[in-house]
Structure formats: C-alpha cells, structure tokens
C-alpha cells in the first residue's frame, strides 16, 4: 500500500514537471486553431539557397498584440521546403511593433521560433520586417540561413 502511494506521488511529480517543461511563454495563449475571419491567408516563399524557391499557398497567419509594443504571430500548418516531411505551426514571439494610424510596422532580430513544443535555435529569426493593416499582412525575414517572405490578406 505504501509503495503504491510512492509510485503515484512520483508519477504525479513527473507529469507536473512535463507540463511545466512545455510552457515556453506567451505562445501557449495563442489560438490553437485559426479562425477564418481573424487570420490572414496568403503565400509564403522560401529561398532554398540553391537557385530555387519553395512556395506554399493558403498559409494562415494570426497575431496577438501585447501592451509592451510587442506581438506574437503564428504561421499555421507550414513547411519550408518540399522535402520537409511534415507541416508544423511556427510561433514567433516578441516582435517589436510601432503604430502609425491603422498600420503596424514590425521589426525583430534574434528571435528563436517555437514549433512542436520547443525552441528551434537553428532557425533563429533575424532581419524581420513587416507590416499589418486591417486587410493585409506582409513579412520578410531570415529563418536561419533561409530568406522567407509572406504576403496575406483577410
């Protein structure tokens, strides 16, 4: 009886540690599934650095503003090369923004993206520039060594 309680306690502690390990910032507060009306839908282009370009259409991107003039965005169900075996949701946190009328101007450098529950340091986001209006979103950044652009509309 005593051993069963110890095993249960250890199992509970292990589950708690695993749950805490999966917490990695604001990205857990973003919508798990995009809502069609709130997401931008567009094309993402990734320069493969071998003279070819990989294009993925119908990419959904959503964002969340924070009070400290940063935002997070999520690119849903994306892959960055035709040989990539699966699609993933990529979260980019801590993008700086400024506001001019109804336009947000974005910038960021040295941002580690999250995907599949963990950080992807190899694909650190650098030279991020972009803009968001009520109807359009445009992004340009380096994802590791790969130049990426995105253009979407609502």
Question: How would you describe each model-predicted region?
Answer:
Residues 2-5, 18-43, 142-154:
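Bacterial Sec-dependent N-terminal signal peptides
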Residues 42-53, 79-86, 113-121, 141, ...:
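Flexible, membrane-facing loop/turn or short amphipathic-helix motifs
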Residues 78-129:
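Contiguous, well-ordered beta-strand patches that form the walls/edges
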Residues 10-19:
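Bacterial N-terminal signal peptides
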Residues 58-65, 92-97, 125-131, 150-152:
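Hydrophobic/aromatic beta-strand elements that line small-molecule binding cavities or substrate pockets
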Residues 54-93:
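N-terminal glycine/threonine-rich, aromatic-flanked beta-hairpin/loop signature
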Residues 65-70, 96-104, 133-134:
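A short, structured loop/turn motif at beta-sheet edges
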Residues 128-147:
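Short, exposed beta-strand-loop hairpins at the edges of beta-sheets
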